[in-house]
Amino acid sequence: MKILFCLLLLAITALEAGVVKRYNKRFAGFNVAGIGGNAGCVVVDNKLFANSFFLRELTTEEQRELAQYIEDSNRYKEEVKESLEERRKGWQLARDGKEDSKVLSALAEKKLPKPPKKPSFCSAGDTTQYYFDGCMVQNDKIYVGRAYVRDLTPDEVTQLKTFDAKMTAYQKYLSSTIQKQVDSLFGEKSNLFNLFADTRTEATSQASDDATAGATTTQAPVEAPEPPHFCVAIY
């Protein structure tokens, strides 16, 4: 069972990597957890960077927005810390038999605090990176390595938006296809939390239902989109 599961993970990883390695796009954003790195938005002395690339100076209004975000972020971290500590104490009492199941269930169902809203100057358009053969596009600017080349033309911006929409649809299709293949092998056990659980009867029933549904509804295949030709790589 363990060997089969490992082989399956390797196959899925290879399939996903083989399909999107040439036309990959990466989303990044503000890191509320406070872990270091150069991904997403970073502000130093009111200078805005996205994925380590300098964008511009923050305006006065954006500086006020940043100050509010910092305040909200610090409060959020404290709320998460308190919430996790509350759960830890509840589980400890339950383990010692000092707390009933209803209280423990209420703690488990209690949602964690919501993170603060990202500042308006750190949008997906600012931080999304599109990797093509030979170059990268971020914030409608073309880079070769870390060297800025030029801005996209209005027509190229439209091409990029079309590519983004098609690639998003393709990645969803690919993920759905892989999930169906996993479900056909493990049924409900494709969920990693339930993979080794004793749910044979339910898995068999689910697999049967999926097979019936698959016989009546067939999803049209989605092809990988042709990438825009913003640069030419010579091999």
From Swiss-Prot:
InterPro entries: Pepsin-I3, Pepsin-I3_sf, Protease_Inhibitor_I33
A Pfam family reported for this protein in Swiss-Prot or TrEMBL: Pepsin-I3
Record's signal peptide: 1-17
Disulfide bonds: 135-231
Protein's cellular compartments: Secreted
UniProt keyword list: Aspartic protease inhibitor, Disulfide bond, Protease inhibitor, Secreted, Signal
Gene3D superfamilies reported for this sequence: Pepsin inhibitor-3
Entry keyword GTP-binding: no
Membrane-spanning residues: none
Tissue specificity comment: Reproductive organs and muscle.
CDD domains xref list: API3
Family affiliation: Belongs to the protease inhibitor I33 family.
The protein, known as: Immunodominant antigen Ov33-3
